[in-house]
Amino acid sequence: MGKKSKASKKRLAKLERQNSRVPAWVMMKTNRDVQRNPKRRNWRRNDTDE
């Protein structure tokens, strides 16, 4: 594990933001058409290619 560069840290921060569930209000607004986030990722199981 070396030092994280600023660019690498920025990419990891973006992946962390993307790794969240679909908000409840979106599910309500779309009448549950949108229920899951296909970009969900587990920190232990899935790789980020970073």
UniProtKB/Swiss-Prot annotation:
SUPFAM superfamilies: Ribosomal protein L39e. It holds the Pfam family Ribosomal_L39. PROSITE patterns: RIBOSOMAL_L39E. Residues 1-20, 30-50 are annotated as: Disordered. It comes from the Archaea. GO terms for molecular function: structural constituent of ribosome. Coiled coil: none annotated. InterPro entries: Ribosomal_eL39, Ribosomal_eL39_CS, Ribosomal_eL39_dom_sf. Belongs to the eukaryotic ribosomal protein eL39 family. This is Large ribosomal subunit protein eL39. The gene is rpl39e.
